[in-house]
Amino acid sequence: GCPWRDLPASFGKFQAIYNCFNRWSKKGIIHNIFKILSADADKEWLMMDGSHIRAHQHSAGAAAHSGEDDHAIGISRGGATSKIHLIVDACGNPLEVIITAGNVNDVSIAPELIAAVDLAETEVVSADKGYDSDKLRAQIEEEGSKANIPYKRDREEKNKDMDWYLYKIRHLVENAFARLKHYRAIATRYDKLK
């Protein structure tokens, strides 16, 4: 990842590359390529989580042509951030990605993540306590899967139905974030494109 102006001249004019990328992004072409690549996923177990990404000063200060939500950059305790919400298969391969402002709660995006993935083959959906919600559990169970999400400490329900072995395998989603953040453009946001 680098600023658009720093692309090698052999690629062509940076404005043309930027316009092509932006056009493909708006038309959903990049998303469709991702969907085709993830078609043969092992969906027996799914894991989901969210991770913050710092927004570089160049992305946070660029002129806005549309609403703030279009750029998924929010202000939180760590400054300007974005958040990647990710659901991965049993092998740790990403199935669905949603990018929001950094101050968006995980559980508020989870229904959209679940709706974007076909749970017909899925036995268990695993997530951390940040996804503790009766509404989310009901959505997962309506799809025919089991929600393996621990209750928060302040809830009366106990975690007697938890499969702690599968919960430990949830590290696959953390590993996916680690792999993604090896790429400079993902570890730090450099532009306002969503």
Regions flagged by a language model, labelled:
Residues G1-K194:
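Short alpha-helical elements
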